[in-house]
Amino acid sequence: MASKCPKCDKTVYFAEKVSSLGKDWHKFCLKCERCNKTLTPGGHAEHDGKPFCHKPCYATLFGPKGVNIGGAGSYIYEKPPTEAPQVTGPIEVPVVRTEERKTSGPPKGPSKASSVTTFTGEPNMCPRCNKRVYFAEKVTSLGKDWHRPCLRCERCSKTLTPGGHAEHDGQPYCHKPCYGILFGPKGVNTGAVGSYIYDKDPEGTVQP
């Protein structure tokens, strides 16, 4: 049975489909959520399950402010600040109260966990190791929360950065060489000059 395109909600037939983010799209429906540029499967960033072009849109919306992820440049699209920080002076806390709080018991594990839980009150589970992901150690990609070291290429296990990797069937891959080897045109390293053919049978005869 043909699936539904998540962009236009119409049936996607085999001849017109591309697969990305674990879903089937019409080729011209796989567009950046911000600028509407047509994207290629695995050649785009992702945030909350939606596709974005790497530059400038993903870097503008979700990258470190003023830094274009993956290259030099600045992509700041924010309104200029109209007000200076209204700080009239340092806030002083009596030393006695601080000491009293320390003697009553310093915050430990439970309070830390409660500060990093999700809206449901429960930490999310990492799709790689199936363990809880707390705020201080999480990165978000493919609509899921991962431990930083767990967001790795499915093929070579290289650690990846959120939005800086390819995707196939909901799994993360590095762009080069792994995604190009597995899912790109045979003999072509997608996105750069070179040849990356890793057939299962290296001793097999070369097809003309």
UniProtKB/Swiss-Prot annotation:
Which CDD domains does the record match to this protein?
LIM1_TLP
Q: Does the keyword Metal-binding apply?
A: yes
**Where does the source fall among the domains of life?**
Eukaryota
Q: Which gene does this sequence derive from? A: Crip2
Q: What is this protein called?
A: Cysteine-rich protein 2
**N6-acetyllysine carried by residues:** 23, 138, 144
Q: How does it assemble?
A: Interacts with TGFB1I1.
Q: Which residues form the LIM zinc-binding domain?
A: 5-57, 126-178
The answer to keyword Ribosomal protein applying to this record is no
Q: Pfam families from the entry?
A: LIM
One of the record's GO molecular function terms: metal ion binding
Q: Which InterPro entries match?
A: Znf_LIM (IPR001781)
Q: Name one GO biological process term.
A: positive regulation of cell population proliferation
Gene Ontology cellular component terms for the protein in this record: cell cortex
Q: Which residues carry this modification: Phosphoserine?
A: 104
What tissue expression does the UniProt record report for this protein? Answer: Expressed more abundantly in liver and kidney of females than that of males. Equally expressed in brain, lung and heart.
Which SMART domains does the entry link to? LIM
Entry keyword set: Acetylation, LIM domain, Metal-binding, Phosphoprotein, Repeat, Zinc
